[in-house]
């Protein structure tokens, strides 16, 4: 399943499980990290993280959870859990989830890290600290770039 299909799968199955109203979100994050230790560039790494949030309202009772695995089995288990949570919660007339809206796409900032600029900026920072504050022993410095994509239904 692609990302949009994963969110649709979650929402469809929440409704099949008996939710009066439901919402699902999938957050995919990529982090580029550059580290300096004792004045030397020592590490460049890329990490990926994903999590899925789901909320349901059934009989004016609410349940919510967040998972970090997005395979069908994990989603199905979380759906069962969130439905149990809703059953066990206290009803509140104020609980609500907005009606479905037309799909939209939003963007802010750069989608990709400029690795050359990251390296150069961190190198300049280390040089600046060493020349301006010679008594300081810069043990560690980290520069990172984060990019997130959120799919919500």
Task: Describe the predicted segments one by one.
Residues 1-2:
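Basic/polar N-terminal segments that are highly enriched at the extreme N-terminus
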Residues 32-87:
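N-terminal alpha-helical targeting/anchoring segments
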Residues 5-13, 21-31, 76-153:
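Acidic low-complexity segments
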């Amino acid at each position: 399943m692609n990302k949009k299909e994963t969110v649709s799968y979650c929402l469809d199955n929440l409704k099949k499980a008996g939710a009066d109203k439901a919402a699902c979100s999938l957050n995919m994050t990529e982090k580029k990290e550059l580290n300096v230790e004792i004045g030397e560039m020592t590490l460049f790494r890329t990490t990926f993280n994903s999590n899925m949030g789901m909320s349901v309202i059934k009989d004016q009772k609410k349940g919510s959870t967040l998972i970090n695995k997005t395979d069908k089995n994990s989603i199905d288990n979380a759906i069962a859990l969130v439905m149990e949570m809703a059953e066990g919660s206290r009803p509140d007339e104020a609980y609500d989830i907005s009606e479905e809206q037309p799909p939209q796409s939003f963007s802010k900032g750069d989608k990709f890290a400029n690795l050359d600029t990251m390296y150069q900026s961190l190198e300049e920072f280390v040089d600046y600290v060493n020349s301006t504050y010679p008594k300081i022993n810069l043990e560690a410095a980290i520069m990172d770039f984060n990019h997130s994509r959120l799919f919500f239904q």
